[in-house]
């Protein structure tokens, strides 16, 4: 796990996003923006923050790092997986396909808190169930 280098800017970037989210919340509470606008701005802020953390991770990851070399060569993994391992998981979708406003701020190296763990596990379980159902459907259609 020592190969997964957490970017030092991560906490600053998350704190900056929290400040922006608080400003959006104040605008919403004053009635200056609608709930849909608040939702869209919140999602945009967290997507931008996740991208910034990913960029900081890529910039701080040494080129001779084993994890980086595997992803860069295409042998195993991708930068998205490295982002989840050492950056931040980011935004996830609920069962209806809508993006949840609260991102998973932690990564697998730091460890997820209980809420982040259950949200993440639910998404993984749903993905496995969907795959199993699609496999059964395609098998039936080949008859």
Where are these regions (language model features)?
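Append "with occasional cross-activation on large, charged helical scaffolds in nucleic-acid assemblies
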Residues: 1-143
